Every structure is written in C-alpha cells, then in structure tokens.
Regions:
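Phosphate-binding P-loop
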Residues: 8-14
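Short beta-strand-centered segment that lines the nucleotide-binding/catalytic pocket of NTP-utilizing
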Residues: 40-56
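Short phosphate-coordinating micro-motif centered on Lys-Gly-acidic
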Residues: 75, 80-144
Length: 144
C-alpha cells in the first residue's frame, strides 16, 4: 500500500495506471493505498470492482478503479465507454490491464504485482511514454 500511497500523491490527472497480477497479488490493496495518497477519505470503502466493473472515488481529482476480469474480451467492454474514463480529468487504475486492447492506450504506467508469500509482494514498474517515465522518476525519488 505504501507504493500506491506515494504514487497517489504524485499524479496530476489524466494518468492511466495498469495493474497486472494474479488473483490475490495485491492489485486492490495497491489501489487502496493510491486512494489514500490522492486524498480519498477513509469513509470511502475502496474495494474491488469485480462485479460493478468501475468504482469512482473523489479525492483531489476523480479516481476511476476499473476491473476487466469479467469483461476480458473487447466486445464485452464495448458498453463501458472506457475511453471516457481513460482520457478524462481523473486518474484511471485498471486491474487486469492485460485485457485492455492495445489500441485503447498509447502511453501508460504498468505495474505488475507478484505475491511472494505472506504479506510480501514484488512490484515491477514499466513506463510507456515520457510523461510516465517522469512520473516513475519522481516515484523513485520518493522511496530513496
């Protein structure tokens, strides 16, 4: 959660953050930390949108928590109007990011989470695009 919290403090709006990892790898926990960092109040119960597909939270900017687990195929995603969320003023965090068709996003920050046992997780960050490379550099400075 601490990495998510730190990242939530750094975003400016309009970011797309893809979360990749098996069930139980910590994707939703990462979003909880992110929500705290961006100023979503503790009264907002951040939970997986597996069944609602999209949860929206209010912080210093809107946070769109999207879960594509149950809508893995592009034709199943068609009615979600994902582009409105992905390219709006808020920040979109997309669980099961690998299910988003590649043509939907040009630049993004992808975070792969791996459960190592117990409470340990490994996070790998990949920035695609200058904006996200800069964001990742800022995040590194926060944790050093």
């Amino acid at each position: 959660m601490s990495w998510g919290r730190k990242l939530g403090k750094l975003v400016q709006g309009g970011e797309i953050i893809g979360l990749v990892g098996e069930l139980g790898s910590g994707k939703t926990a990462f979003v909880r930390g992110f929500a705290e960092g961006i100023g979503v109040g503790k009264e907002a119960w951040v939970r997986s949108p597996t069944f609602t597909l999209i949860n929206e939270y209010s912080g210093r900017m809107p946070v769109f928590h999207i879960d594509l687990y149950r809508v893995a195929k592009p034709e199943e995603q068609a009615g979600l109007n994902l582009r409105e969320y992905l390219y709006g003023d808020g920040v979109s965090l997309v669980e099961w990011f690998e299910y988003l068709p590649a043509e939907e996003v040009d630049e993004y920050l992808e975070i792969s989470l791996t459960h190592l046992g117990g409470a340990k997780r490994e996070l790998k960050f990949v920035a695609l695009g200058e904006r996200y490379e800069m964001l990742l550099r800022k995040l590194r400075l926060e944790v050093e």
